[in-house]
Amino acid sequence: MSYPFELGGETLWDAGYHSGQLYASLARGAAEFLELPSGLTPNDQGGCDVETELFRAFVEGLDGMYSSTKNQVLHGLAHGLLVTSLVLLERAEGEITLTHRYAATLLEEKAVLARAMG
């Protein structure tokens, strides 16, 4: 059983059911924390539709929080969500510019995770 993330009928990430559910839940929680829409909408196929511009703004907000916090716990909590979101955003043909001190590491981790995400 899977949890697909789709854009215009194209599957961007055919996540495993539990991985997809957890990611969507974490994104909802982070969006609420950031006071931004996540750009992910549950669909009838048991996954989520991605609205690229809203999702891009969410990822940008998440990255802004991640790159500016000095709180190691908050930084750690946001890390996996951000890397996964960067992969999904790239697949949705959206992008943000990473210019902070974590940029190179995040881009390397994004490339590794993208392969694992299929």
Protein language model regions, located:
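Acidic (Asp/Glu-rich) sequence patches and key acidic residues
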Residues: 1-118
